[in-house]
């Protein structure tokens, strides 16, 4: 068996989140909101924050935003979608008030410069192709299937075995 090293990953001391509470409050959110798929197969997002008083900032392609990918057999990296000024996303969406998501958001905001924060859905037996985001990302698996993994800088992380503590 191959031994995986996570020495190149940054861990924040004393940063812990309760995944059970996130799951419980996810159910509350899903009673109020649906995942926006943008018509893209196996993709869905629910924005957690927005540009203050700007509902357009969480609509259409503002839900996804710019990224780079290898689109074809040439291997050339190309830009996709629209550029977004993530630093403007500072207001928590009203439906996340009085949830554990707000506590997580406020904790992260006190330690890091945040941009857009979203709940993302990847349906079972679906994948994302290689891509690069314009900013660093933090991914917290809330619900995942055994065998689910994420490759970050050629290192594979098993989502169901990771924890935030």
Report each predicted region and the residues it spans.
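Short aromatic-centered micro-motifs
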Residues: 150
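Acidic-glycine-rich active-site phosphate/pyrophosphate-binding loop
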Residues: 114
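Non-heme Fe(II)/2-oxoglutarate
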Residues: 1-104
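Conserved small/polar residues in nucleotide/adenosyl-binding loops
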Residues: 155-162
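Short, conserved beta-strand element in jelly-roll/cupin
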Residues: 133-147
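Conserved short histidine dyad/triad with adjacent acidic residue
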Residues: 118-131
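Gly/Pro- and small hydrophobic-enriched strand-loop and loop-to-helix capping segments
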Residues: 165
């Amino acid at each position: 068996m191959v031994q995986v090293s996570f020495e190149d990953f940054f861990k924040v001391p004393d940063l812990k989140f309760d995944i059970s509470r996130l799951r419980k409050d996810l159910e509350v959110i899903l009673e109020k909101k649906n995942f926006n798929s943008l018509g893209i197969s196996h993709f869905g997002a629910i924005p957690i924050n927005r540009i203050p008083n700007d509902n357009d900032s969480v609509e259409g392609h503002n839900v996804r935003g710019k990224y780079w990918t290898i689109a074809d057999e040439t291997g050339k990296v190309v830009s996709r979608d629209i550029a977004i000024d993530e630093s403007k996303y500072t207001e928590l969406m009203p439906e996340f008030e009085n949830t554990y998501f707000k506590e997580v958001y406020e904790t992260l905001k006190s330690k890091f410069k945040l941009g857009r924060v979203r709940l993302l859905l990847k349906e079972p037996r679906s994948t994302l192709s290689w891509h690069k985001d314009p900013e660093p990302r933090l991914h917290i698996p809330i619900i995942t299937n055994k065998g689910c993994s994420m490759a970050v800088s050629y290192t594979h992380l098993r989502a169901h075995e990771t924890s935030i503590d």
